[in-house]
Amino acid sequence: SPYPNGLDEKVYLELLKKVILGDFNPEQVVLLEVEPEKQNTKIDFYYAKRDLGIPIVCVTEVSKEKNQLFYRNAQGEKIRIRRIYNRVIFDELHARKDLKLQFSFEDLLDVEWAGHPNWYTRISKFILPYLHGPYFIETTLLSELKSIPDDLENYVLKPLFSFSGAGVVFHVKKE
């Protein structure tokens, strides 16, 4: 099974809902991203919307009143955001000087996080070398590689702290 700890799809989705929704109505929980419709990972967002019932919201569509955040649903109604499933990568956010946000991630906000905004650097590719099992590809940090393999056509290089396919090298050469 591709699900952790031998879970089946139904039990896994129930657990995922508990983790991401917490105690809130799905309409009050948002998947937050920078221009989500333009992201290479948008398929993940659509599945989250389908399976969890949560809206996909761009950071520029969030408004702030005092310490509370809001978005407008498909009917144009203002909905308070109670919990955020954060998909914003701050390297991208800081590089996008054209974005006009009405709040800062550094603000003291009356909102819960389904995963802290900085966790992506800890639970991303960094942990891959430490995961073992039939559903994990063998991964080695380049700095820990003892010798260069002869069959480089079977390898891919991926920068540790990049995102959405940036910097991937498919045709690896010894140079």
Predicted regions, residues:
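Domain-scale recognition of functional cores that engage charged ligands
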Residues: P2-E175
